[in-house]
Curated annotation (Swiss-Prot):
Main localization category: nucleus
Family: Belongs to the HSF family.
Name by which UniProt lists this protein: Heat shock transcription factor
Alphabetized UniProt keyword annotations: Activator, DNA-binding, Nucleus, Stress response, Transcription, Transcription regulation
Localisation: Nucleus
Disulphide connectivity of cysteines: none
Pfam families the UniProt entry points to: HSF_DNA-bind
Gene: HSF
One Gene Ontology cellular component: nucleus
Cited function: DNA-binding transcription factor that specifically binds heat shock promoter elements (HSE) and activates transcription.
Subunit structure: Homotrimer. Homotrimerization increases the affinity of HSF1 to DNA.
Regions recorded as binding DNA: 17-115
Upper classification of the organism: Eukaryota, Fungi, Fungi incertae sedis, Microsporidia, Enterocytozoonidae
Region Involved in trimerization, annotated ranges: 130-169
Molecular function (Gene Ontology), one example: sequence-specific DNA binding
Length: 245
């Protein structure tokens, strides 16, 4: 919250010009006076509680004890009442383009029109101040809009960068996953091929053993047959020998 500025020295000439406005500025700047103050930006006059203001601070600014008379004085000097959004009827806010906490040099420009057409002039002054207030509000709103645009642009840049980082990380994750699956598939295929080869080798060994066993059996059979034939020949020969001799 902005600090309220200390009371600035006001020349006697300024006091003679407008004692009411200078007293108003002095009390509004006085940090010990909580019944009337500037807003945070220092460009609007705030009376937080009208009842407390009438009891504690009105007599320091105006000779009247009537709040309506005090408001008329503000209107005569061109102050514009600002409508509150919250509808608090016990709080009043006023604006004047030359009544600013940080620009006491502008106070001398706040004057009361004393011409015959005073009512018209006062209304014009109030109207001009209202336009000035609207222009000030529009400027602030435009500044806020520009600030929001800058923030949105910054957020969009950060979002794009973050999106790119996440996309790259996701893409790398997919690539690693695919590489892992490929290696896993290759390893499985290799193990499967090795298992098949070993199985085929075992089968081949079994078949070889069977073949060798069969061959051995056939050889044994053949040897046995040959042996029988030899025995028969010997027997025949012996018989022949016995017959002739």
């Amino acid at each position: 919250m902005a600090k309220r500025k200390e009371v600035t020295e006001i020349s006697e000439m300024d006091i003679k010009k407008s004692g009411f406005v200078n007293r108003l500025y002095r009390e509004t700047c006085d940090i010990s006076n909580k019944y009337i103050k500037f807003d945070d930006d220092g460009d609007k006059l705030i009376i937080p509680n009208k009842i407390d203001f009438i009891k504690k601070a009105l007599n320091k600014i105006s000779s009247t004890k009537d709040y309506s008379s005090f408001v008329r004085q503000l209107n005569n000097y061109g102050f514009t009442k600002i409508k509150l959004d919250n509808g608090d009827s016990n709080c009043d806010i006023y604006y004047h383009q030359n009544f600013h906490r940080d620009h006491p040099d502008l106070i001398s420009l706040i004057t009361r029109d004393k011409s015959k057409n005073g009512d018209y002039k006062d209304n014009m002054t109030t109207f001009i101040n209202s336009l000035q207030y609207l222009a000030s509000c529009n400027y602030k709103q435009q500044k806020e809009i520009n600030d929001l645009k800058d923030r949105i642009k910054t957020l969009e840049t950060k979002y794009a960068t973050l999106y790119e980082i996440i996309s790259n990380a996701f893409r790398q994750g997919i690539e690693q996953y695919q590489k892992h699956n490929t290696m896993y598939f290759n390893n499985n295929s290799l193990l499967k091929n090795m298992f098949t080869y070993n199985q085929e080798l075992d089968d081949l060994k079994d078949n070889t053993n069977v073949y060798n066993n069969a061959k051995l059996i056939n050889q044994l059979k053949l040897d046995a047959k040959n042996s029988n034939q030899d025995d028969n020949i010997k027997k025949t020969k012996n018989a022949f020998d016995e017959f002739y001799f």
